[in-house]
Amino acid sequence: MLIKKVHLSWSPIVALLIFPLVAPADSKYPWLDQISRQEQLLMGCENMGLKYKKKVTVNMLNHILVDHHHKLLYCYVPKVACTNWKRVLMVLTGESNATNPIQISASTAHLDNSTLKLSQLTVPEIRESLRQYTLFLVARHPFERLLSAYRNKFLGNNTISNYFKNRYGKYIIQKYRKKSMFADSGSDFVTFREFIQYLIKEGVRSNEHWTPIYDLCLPCSLDYNFISRYETIPDDASTILNMVNAPSLVFPATRSGRTKDNLRFYFQQLSIYEIEALYKLYEADFKLFGYGLEEMLGYDLA
């Protein structure tokens, strides 16, 4: 069943009225960031012809988690601090007895039944929640997120990495590796270029870890009250928790990885054609959330 578009009439004026009242004391005018991010999203949707393009059905809302008590909706995006936000929601909803989100293991946070999904509600409940609750997502540079997924899922040595190697890696190597490459080493590690060739040829929707945010969260079809960014997540999380009257809850510190530092190293392995083709696959995420190539790779596409 289709879910009709819910209009919240968000505007910069509304932001100026709301955010000063809920911003943490040490935050520097977070509502100004929201004005910029909301305008970027609105213009991106309109300029790309994506406004209301997707007809939203119930099963498309699987990534939106629900906290009825705090009237909060969170669209989780893998590789964008979603483990910590899932932990926080488990504390907020009482699904966990923990008082500190970091006490909840990552495996527990990712259990399918750890938090209620919007798609599990009735259609009237979904419409009411979208109308009345605070809906937010966290964005990240598409290429940074993609590299994080590759390194975590294909270069690791744990149960989850082994699953990805078996589920995707063997197929990618079989189809995209040149016969002579690594013939003597017997390497079963997918190279970054092989992974990118797989995405270019077969699409980016085979797994949620590299599916674009545009497809996971439907930002041009649903009205988001708050757009967070991975780069500013400590301040953004504090603002959101203040908005839902949970200021004492501390968002776990985000682990400082080396993904951003490694971007140029990995992307230098790709041809210009491959980078352009990959950009097209994630173009909506780049334009909706205001990301570019220059700040990551040192150049932009002409």
Language-model features: where?
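Membrane-interface amphipathic segments in extracytoplasmic regions
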Residues: 2-302
